[in-house]
Design a protein with these regions (language model features):
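Acidic catalytic/metal-coordinating carboxylates
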Residues: 35-38, 61-67
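Conserved acidic carboxylate
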Residues: 10
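Two-component/phosphorelay signaling modules centered on CheY-like receiver
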Residues: 13-31, 120
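C-terminal output helix
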Residues: 108-118
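Acidic, metal-coordinating helix/loop segments flanking the phosphotransfer/catalytic sites
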Residues: 32-50
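The feature encodes the CheY-like receiver
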Residues: 58, 76, 88
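Alpha4 helix (beta4-alpha4-beta5 surface) of REC/receiver domains from two-component response regulators
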Residues: 20, 64, 87-102, 115
Length: 126
């Protein structure tokens, strides 16, 4: 079985560094980009198993990226975990309305993030 791949879309370097460490430690291959347009370019190049997608990004929002993934016949099966510092029920509902598979509010515990990623990738492999 090949290693699962994660595309991390996060524009804040300090958060991206922490997430890169956590995701890598969990045993997943990782690619990080820092903007909405870079996310679309990365998705055109390769199909990850999971996209960890910040809501607030330069150029295009995470909501827009998620909707574009879901509308694309080739990409729509990719799992999407949206993350935001904006928090609150309204943001979570917007993320789920954009067809995200899961939504987490920063700050979150490392164990919670790892558990969520593991669960999404277990579903993907089922």
């Amino acid at each position: 079985m090949s290693q699962k791949t994660v595309l991390l879309v996060e524009d804040e370097d300090n958060i991206a560094l922490a997430l890169t460490h956590l995701i890598g430690r969990a045993g997943y291959a990782l690619r990080r980009v820092a903007s909405g347009n870079a996310a679309l370019e990365a998705l055109a190049e390769e199909r990850p198993d999971l996209v960890v997608l910040d809501v607030m990004l330069p150029e295009r929002s995470g909501y827009e990226i998620c909707q574009l993934i879901r509308r694309d016949a080739v990409l729509r099966g990719i799992k999407v975990l949206m993350i935001t510092a904006g928090g609150g029920e309204v943001e979570r509902r917007k993320g789920m309305a954009a067809w995200a598979d899961a939504f987490m509010t920063k700050p979150f515990a490392a164990a919670d993030l790892t558990a969520q990623i593991n669960a999404l990738l277990a579903e993907e492999g089922a």
